[in-house]
Amino acid sequence: MSGGHQLQLAVLWPWLLMATLHAGFGHTGRVLAAAVESERSAEQKAVIRVIPLKMDPTGKLNLTLEGVFAGVAEVTPAEGKLMQSHPLYLCNASDDDNLEPGFISIVKLESPRRAPRPCLSLASKARMAGERGANAVLFDITEDRSAAEQLQQPLGLTKPVVLIWGSDAAKLMEFVYKNRKAYVWIELKEPPAGANYDVWILLTVVGTVFVIILASVLRIRCRPHHSRPDPLQQRTARAISQLATRRYQAGCRRARAEWPDSGSSCSSTPVCAICLEEFSEGQELRVISCLHEFHRTCVDPWLYQHRTCPLCMFNIVEGDSFSQAPAASPSYQEPGRRLHLIRQHPGHAHYHLPSAYLLGPSRTSVARTPRPRPFLPSQEPSMGSRHQRLPRTSHLRAPEEQQHLAVSPHPYAQGWGLNRLRCTSQHPAACPVALRRARPHESSGSGESYCTERSGYLADGPASDSSSGPCHGSSSDSVVNCTDVSLQGIHGSSSTFRSSLSSDFDPLVYCSPEGDLQGKGIQPSVTSRPRSLDSVVPRGETQVSSHIHYHRHRHHHYKRQFQWHGRKPGPETGIPQSMPAASHTQLEPSLPDQQLITPNPTASSMLPNPQRPRALTEPAPGLAEASSPSPSPKPNPSGLLNLQKSSLTVRHPHRKRRGGPSEPLPTSLPPDLTVHTACPVFPHYSPRLAYPWPPEVHPLMFRPPGPDRRLLHEVPGPCYSSSQPVWLYLNPCQPLGPCLPGEGHSKWTFDSPEGRRCPYSHCQVLPAQPGSEEELEELCEQAV
């Protein structure tokens, strides 16, 4: 039954009770009323005792009669000798009879039919009797009952008037008729003692019950309606009661050891984030499940109202931690999203992570789903329908493909410090990269845990001065790269030129979701450097480039300590017109003719602008693989010596320049490019290759052993693909092999400790082309 029905019943049931009492005690009520009326009349009754003057030893002649006092006279007791009087006697005013006063006169009234016209009224006769010396008058109204009404009108007579009728009147008249002398006492009849008590007791009980019922009704109606306690409030109170509390102690190190990710910091005095007051000795602190500490008096009201941590929004009721929330909505992993981080120092990206991200991955080999980093996504302005990109996820390899990947380490790979690099993929999206969580020493000490990753890109801004030469980052960042500022990182546009600086993500920030390795026994050991998302185009995508409007930063220092042999073909440089702006990988013409002339319509159809030559280009990722006549081609030793790299990276004493991959021109591609080279592996998806940056942004730099040798993780595998721009130190050396007619020898080789030359397509250099340093500087300035 609802509360409204209960209230209505509470209001109505007193009235129902009263009706029940009236129905049950109706007869009793009427009897009670009659009793009260009789008691009222009883007070007017008189007791008439008649005692004969002659003593009767038996007492049978003694009479006790009842009568009623008339209203015309006073109700008082009286006594005297009994004397009969005729009605007509009382009409005579003469005093012929000398009667002794003090007698009781009895008058028997006749029927009104016999005396229609009485001489005097009954009241007058009663006065007349009193005047003649009677102490009281007794009227027998047996034959005239109307006399009672006549005698009820009060006239103020001093002598009492008593009315008798019936049997009592007959007994008295019989005594008179026998001429017996008697003495009469008229007394007031006392009412019974218990009658009034019973009535008042009943009235008291009924009144008490009624009062109790009325009080109950008023209490129910006037009581405030308190709603049931909210279950969520109960859960919140229970969760707050289960939170830990502690007394603050000045020893910061011990406190930090107990709470590694607490809101306090050893670098400064801990402060309550709510009241902004420093913790003092002995204060009671509330420690939330996320290990943030506040004054108990400050945070408890907040927790009761919001149920979340004021800093990290950890829900104390639901238990949704900071690391679990992004897993449900990894919207920032979608294409066209930009990640916003706090940039506090040049060359570093600082982002806030919970303690779970600082503990490192599990040592087990069980594969888990990647946990993304908690950042705020925003839509990239330049992303359109034709810029949709496939999610960069790892793909499992079929067992039959893995059988062709077990090759021995190549000696050249060993010379580069990659003696454990293995060929694990033939698809650009097939090899996930080992991960690394933030090192504890890279976290800040401002009270929260911040992971400092090397961003690899330093834009012009208040915190950086690119005109001062090398980048001035923090002392711990030894690999900060100085590059031109790309407007694609701010506005975004579309063109056919692809650069490693154009990315779906913020150019100032490199970050990505973390996940465990999918290989067996693979454990991350070094940090991961972010890669540009435009540096690699997956195989299944349309190779649509993003236009890069390079801002001419004249203040950038382009040193002239390196050489560039040739900038464009034509009569000025002496290069044949058939050669492209940047040479592509060529194989020795010893393969079958049908392989040399096999067209590649897929690769050609994906080139948006084949008429525009590029200064820095390299083969598209899918050319060699799409044109391969066999699933696992064998390398050509003689052709490997003549492979040439299309993107040349030079050694600069102060900064390292970037080169972006671009699509080759179908009109200028030599037929040798259609031949499947040896082991076309795409390194940024290899599960055996671990870069010091998260997998979302893979390395833009791949360097041999040197000052930054720590950035490269040595993993097995002899192969490396040309689908990713590679940055290497180059030194003048002898050409790798015989040159074709009209081509000069390459004067650049890799700066490896052993002096080995890389035989693969991504490691080769451009052919020697004439050109001056001024042209090279102009080329670098325009970046076209």
Swiss-Prot record:
Chain intervals with Polar residues compositional bias: 583-608
SUPFAM superfamilies (alphabetical): RING/U-box (SSF57850)
Record's comment on post-translational modification: Autoubiquitinated.
GO terms of molecular function: frizzled binding; ubiquitin-protein transferase activity; zinc ion binding
Gene Ontology terms: cellular component: endoplasmic reticulum membrane; nuclear envelope; plasma membrane
Enzyme nomenclature, EC number: 2.3.2.27
Pfam families, sorted: zf-RING_2 (PF13639), ZNRF_3_ecto (PF18212)
Tissue expression notes: Expressed in crypt base columnar cells of small intestinal epithelium. Crypt base columnar cells are small cycling cells residing between the terminally differentiated Paneth cells at crypt bottoms. Colocalizes with Lgr5-positive stem cells.
Stretch list, region Disordered: 364-407, 459-478, 516-671
Subcellular location: Cell membrane; Endoplasmic reticulum membrane; Nucleus envelope
Residue intervals passing through the bilayer: 198-218
Chain intervals annotated as zinc finger (RING-type): 272-313
Residues of this chain annotated as glycosylated in UniProt: 62, 92
Annotated pathway: Protein modification; protein ubiquitination
Any GO BP: Wnt receptor catabolic process
Superkingdom of origin organism: Eukaryota
Membrane topology classification: Single-pass type I membrane protein
Extracellular side: 24-197
Alphabetical UniProt keywords: Cell membrane, Developmental protein, Disulfide bond, Endoplasmic reticulum, Glycoprotein, Membrane, Metal-binding, Nucleus, Signal, Transferase, Transmembrane, Transmembrane helix, Ubl conjugation, Ubl conjugation pathway, Wnt signaling pathway, Zinc, Zinc-finger
Cystine crosslinks: 91-119
InterPro entries per UniProt: RNF43_Znf_RING, Znf_RING, Znf_RING/FYVE/PHD, ZNRF-3_ecto, ZNRF3_Arkadia_E3_ligases
Signal peptide: 1-23
Function of the protein: E3 ubiquitin-protein ligase that acts as a negative regulator of the Wnt signaling pathway by mediating the ubiquitination, endocytosis and subsequent degradation of Wnt receptor complex components Frizzled. Acts on both canonical and non-canonical Wnt signaling pathway. Along with RSPO2 and ZNRF3, constitutes a master switch that governs limb specification.
Family: Belongs to the ZNRF3 family.
Subunit: Interacts with AKAP8L, NONO and SFPQ. Interacts with FZD5. Identified in a complex composed of RNF43, LGR5 and RSPO1. Interacts with RSPO2. Interacts with LMBR1L.
Protein name as annotated: E3 ubiquitin-protein ligase RNF43
Organism: Mus musculus (Mouse)
